[in-house]
């Protein structure tokens, strides 16, 4: 854990159906110095916190029941009643196959963390979303953090349509 961040003023929302997993994430956040931690057990109970605008980071499980973490992410990024469309969202899941990573990325997730995870793994995702936030992109069919992690030189014709 190289970079030091003061988490005492960061407001977290953890959304997970599994009480033990929610408590584990909460305990890790507390160990890192977080004190403002809210827990929600499902999509519907998370909406109140998300609509209030008093959340700085959302950590959600992909496999929420009856509505998924992706549906929650869609609410955050695209619903008119979402208080913060730029809210950093860390997606937790045991589904670490590339298709899940790509689907999360394409839905606008800020970071992805596969289970089982370590405290250091969560810490690194938190540093990424808090200390090194990415620019957001709004194009037809996508609103979310810039999916490019690095700028690579391009050697070719510019084929993008002029806006």
Model-inferred region functions:
Residues 117-130, 134, 138:
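C-terminal output helix
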